[in-house]
Every structure is written in structure tokens, then in C-alpha cells.
Design a protein with these regions (language model features):
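Transmembrane alpha-helices and adjacent helix-loop boundaries
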Residues: 1-198
Length: 198
């Protein structure tokens, strides 16, 4: 439908975010549906992964010239950073259950959103500069490049994600989750949902 012109530009712009949110919904279904824990921190982890991969893409646009390879390296780096933050948040939070787990994970997502809204990051020949005040307080040289511009986010990144890549990632996610559910660990996950004491 895209190549024949039968799809509006609005719908074309919504296809990649729809794929992204489908992947998040699959992960949320694994946590809430199969594990039985009400964790609402997925948006915060998704935010960390997205900003890390976009910042890597923006910072290495001049040095990493192969766009396809840069995209997949950024994807892996974003997933690893989100996983590390998930592990670090999970250490103290795993003792909680029910509404308390939901409150703490929701608070984590809000904290991440508020930090990123005030974060300014730039790069120049002196290195990487951070500020939580404004762009002027970075103290960059005139030829410096902004990576994260506070509430504006990361601007000027190349649009490398496509609907085809999104569908492939949805299928990979479904494959991994279905194999996990049907494995020994998946049966243990569902046993936790059915009987926490066991």
C-alpha cells in the first residue's frame, strides 16, 4: 500500500511507532500476563534504550559512516543499556509485589522522563559536556554539536527505521517470548503467577 500511494502520509508516519509499541506490549504481556506482576516501568526502560541508541547514532554520525551497521549497533547498545538499568532497578524492587511494585516502577518511569526533559548533552573537541540547567551552561566551543537538547530531545538524527525493520523486530520478539514461555524457565514463570509460595 505504501508503494502504490494508497496510504496517507499520516499513516506512514505512524507505522514505525506502532511497531515499537507492539514490541513494548509483548514485553508487558510477558511481565503482567505470564508472570502476574504489575510492573509499569516499561516506558522508562524503553526511554533509556531509545535515548541511548539515538545519542549513539547522533554522536557517531561523522565517524561511523555505514548507516545500516550504525543502526544495528545503536539498537544493541540501547537494548544493553535498558537491560542494565532494568537489572539495577530490579535488585531492590523484586522484593515488592502487587500495588507497591506498580507504584515504584511507575515512579521510575516518571523520574527518567523528568531527568531527560532537563538533560543537555553536547560534544566538541574537549569531549562530552553535561548540564541540567540549559544549553548555554555546557560551555562548548563554537563548533560543538548538541546531542540532547532538554525537552526537545535528540534532534537531527537520520530516519533509518522502517516499517519492514519494525515488523522483523516484532517477529523476533514474538519468537523469543514464545520460546521462553514454552521452555522450562517459562513454566517456572507461570508457576510464580499461579502460586507465589512455590
Amino acid at each position: 500500500m505504501i508503494t502504490t500511494g494508497n496510504m496517507s502520509s499520516l499513516m506512514q508516519g505512524l507505522l514505525v511507532p506502532m511497531c515499537t509499541y507492539s514490541i513494548v506490549a509483548i514485553g508487558l504481556n510477558l511481565c503482567v500476563g505470564y508472570l502476574g506482576e504489575l510492573s509499569i516501568g516499561h516506558a522508562g526502560f524503553m526511554c533509556i534504550g531509545a535515548f541511548t541508541s539515538a545519542a549513539f547514532t547522533k554522536a557517531t554520525m561523522d565517524t561511523f559512516t555505514n548507516a545500516g551497521l550504525r543502526f544495528f549497533v545503536a539498537l544493541i547498545i540501547g537494548a544493553v543499556c535498558a537491560g542494565i538499568f532494568g537489572f539495577l532497578i530490579g535488585i531492590p524492587v523484586l522484593r515488592l509485589k502487587g500495588d507497591y511494585l506498580a507504584i515504584v516502577t511507575l515512579a521510575f518511569g516518571e523520574i527518567i522522563k523528568n531527568i531527560i526533559n532537563v538533560l543537555y548533552v553536547g560534544i566538541d573537541s574537549n569531549g562530552i559536556h553535561f548540564s541540567m540547567k540549559d544549553q548555554m551552561s555546557l560551555g562548548m566551543e563554537p563548533g560543538g554539536k548538541m546531542i540532547i537538547s532538554g525537552a526537545m530531545g535528540i534532534t537531527g538524527t537520520p530516519r533509518q527505521s522502517t516499517f519492514t525493520i519494525g515488523v522483523i523486530l516484532i517477529l523476533v520478539t514474538l519468537f523469543v517470548v514464545l520460546n521462553l514461555i514454552n521452555s522450562r524457565d517459562g513454566r517456572a514463570i507461570m508457576a510464580i503467577r499461579d502460586n507465589r509460595i512455590a
